Amino acid sequence: MGKSLDEIREIYRHPEGISQIAKAKEHEERIAFHTRVRTSDDRNKPVIDFLSKVKAWIAKDKYDIFLSMFHFPVKTNGVTSEIFDKLSRVFDGRNPVYNYQFKSSEDRDDWEYYRKDVLKEPSVWSTDGWDNFKHRINSVLVVDMPEVQVGEKPEPYFFWLPIANVLSYRTCGKDCNLMAYIMYVTDENKIVYIDEERYVRFDKTRENDLILEVDNMHDLGYCPARFFWSDSISLSEPDIKISPITSELDSFDWYLYYSTAKKHLDLYASYPIYSGYERDCHYESHDGKERCDDGFLKNEKNEWITGADGKPMACPICSSKRLRGAGSYVEIPIPDEIHNVPDLKNPITMLSADTGSLEYNVNEEKRLREELVRSVTGGEGELNRSEAINEKQVKAGFESLTTKLNRIKRGFEEAQTFVDSTICLLRYGDSFVSCNINYGTEFYIYTPEELSERYKIMKETGASEAELDALRQQIIETEYRNDPTQMQRLLILNEIEPYSHLTREEAVNLYKENVISEEDLRVKLNLPTFVRRFERENMNIIEFGSALDYKKKIEIIINTLKKYANGLQNVSVRPTE
């Protein structure tokens, strides 16, 4: 049952869920530290906490250097960008379904217009929705209504409400994601309350009193607001939602420290340190007012001579003999020669950083980055061509990433189903029956190049013909997913080519061993020529036999190509054969 206005004001004075809101805000801020790109120095709590940890890890002088190397945007922004780019393939599923049932065909047509032109679906979920998924996982989806209805039908809309704007809330007992009520502050500093019966808006006075501005009823029977994301960190904290990178936040902190500290190493370890015996300089000006002392000038009062910048002026003789270019030069005292034994040490030496240490730091940074991507996306994500990998590893990476995508897909489907159902009920009432949303059964996880590499690996490791057929089909569907005509043509060509997984050379060798017939070999070696002839004498292979069963169509084409291979001329084929 809905609240009275006095009860709503009491909620404002004594809000619920304060501790959970604070935890959710802190969690989102820590996520945003690694996901949101900033160009200005924003020392919020996650940044301060991170720098405090670094300060405890290293000595003070090293910490001061670390601070000078720490700038925004941080290095982990690039890692999370790569991660979420991989996960965004959830919106690139094959065979997506958006099925809406209405009692009236007019309402169904109106909804198709309304959701595409007004709500900007489905693209709004891959833009605004994905942005909230990355940075504000604890945001709340709110379906709202205009204050005044203008057209013939209500015009509900939805938005993502940041958890930082929520003042008080309570979830339903049976559904920990659906709100029983919610109270939040708008950007205009208005106080809004929504429950299962009404939309209420207040103006707030300087005395912190609430003045009623809007009080509109709705007949949904439930509060039109829910947590955007369904998956929680734990059963004990169902209102704190889990991001794909939540469990790796500490690892992101370590990678950021390591990559920043490596900048210090790069600053000096890339260049050698030269050393040589110190040189005795006897420079003195003609008037005797300037003389060299350890490479810098002093006056007749034995005081350092400074330039306009306040720094000691270098000796014109010594400075011209100093090291030019990258590196450092250190002077060492000339050794005393005892008993007239000369010092045979090389007067000029060069000290370089240990190559093994440098390579370790480079490789370790790369390993940490790859491990983060692998941990969050679930598996290899992309095929590594520089390392040996077998078929089982490829399958494991593919299946693990698919599992992650299916989990994310389910979360977006639940959120969009709630929004679309609620908007349809508010706009069409009893005319709306149901909706079914499915982002697709499979995803374009790999690029055509990566799939081709996987195909090569599976072929070399002895995969079955059925597995290779499925992967070849996936390569074609992925590469030509935006060109359905070419996709259909290549799928047909793949069907009619004999021994399609053999190269021309492999086919010839098997023919010599009497494994394949001469007829099949001729078709394989002359397939492009035979197909062009078939299309000249009949029609293109896509349109040919379009009224026939697909299996029958392929059978006719294959038999015709075999006739070509056997030397028959002017063979004409009718699709009705």
State what each model feature region is.
Residues S88-L521, T529:
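Extended alpha-helical, oligomerization-prone segments that build pores/tubes and scaffolds
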